């Protein structure tokens, strides 16, 4: 996603960015899929899965790596769990990150991915909204509490974007927040 200088990447760091980070992200996302932390705030689990997808989108040389990670997470969680509904969020979010990362403005200013993570996290709302519609309660979408869920998903999406940025920055891949990437 970002321009690279020819001499900065060593073989070990390149391997870590292109193979180890995506593989560890898949393992962490799939491993955390069953963890339920009852803190009562909808969308808090994005701090794990979306932040890792954001980090993968920012650190790898090939943008399509994030789609591979999302697809692997979706496939693994579908195999481990009963249905595909909640698992599709990983692939959907990865596809959106892929699209956002390809925008010329984002390639020059990669910190924009942080902001984009907030609305991208709304893919996690697809399953609850579909359940309300399947139940024949279309008015339930606008019910009390749905607006609050949307707001929390946006908040945790932004927080996941910031956390993903921090992870990518910790790997040493990104300019400081607000700096413009070189072309």
Go through each PLM region and give its residues.
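Juxtamembrane/transmembrane-helix boundary motifs in multi-pass membrane proteins
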Residues: 9, 13-17, 41, 61, ...
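Hydrophobic alpha-helical transmembrane segments
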Residues: 19-24, 51, 63-71, 87-92, ...
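Cytoplasmic membrane-interface segments at the C-terminal ends of transmembrane helices
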Residues: 2-15, 55-61, 98-112, 162-183
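Membrane-embedded alpha-helical hairpins and interfacial helices in multi-pass inner-membrane proteins
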Residues: 107-183
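Hydrophobic residues within the alpha-helical transmembrane core of Major Facilitator Superfamily
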Residues: 27, 75-76, 96, 118, ...
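Interfacial aromatic-anchored transmembrane helix boundaries in multi-pass membrane proteins
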Residues: 32-43, 73-102, 132-135
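Hydrophobic transmembrane alpha-helices
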Residues: 2-59, 64
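Juxtamembrane membrane-interface segments at transmembrane alpha-helix termini
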Residues: 55-64, 79-86, 100-109, 125-131
């Amino acid at each position: 996603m970002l321009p690279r200088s020819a001499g900065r990447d060593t073989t070990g760091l390149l391997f870590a960015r292109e193979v180890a980070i995506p593989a560890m992200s898949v393992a962490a996302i799939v491993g955390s899929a069953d963890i339920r932390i009852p803190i009562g705030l909808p969308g808090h689990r994005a701090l794990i899965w979306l932040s890792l997808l954001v980090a993968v989108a920012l650190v790898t040389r090939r943008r399509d790596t994030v789609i591979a990670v999302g697809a692997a997470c979706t496939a693994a969680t579908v195999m481990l769990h009963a249905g595909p509904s909640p698992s599709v969020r990983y692939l959907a979010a990865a596809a959106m990150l892929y699209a956002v990362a390809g925008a010329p403005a984002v390639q020059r200013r990669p910190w924009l991915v942080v902001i984009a993570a907030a609305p991208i996290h709304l893919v996690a709302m697809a399953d609850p909204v579909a359940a309300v519609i399947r139940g024949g309660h279309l008015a339930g979408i606008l019910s009390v509490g749905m607006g609050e869920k949307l707001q929390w998903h946006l908040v945790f999406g932004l927080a996941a974007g910031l956390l993903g940025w921090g992870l990518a920055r910790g790997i040493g891949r990104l300019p400081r927040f607000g700096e413009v990437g070189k072309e």
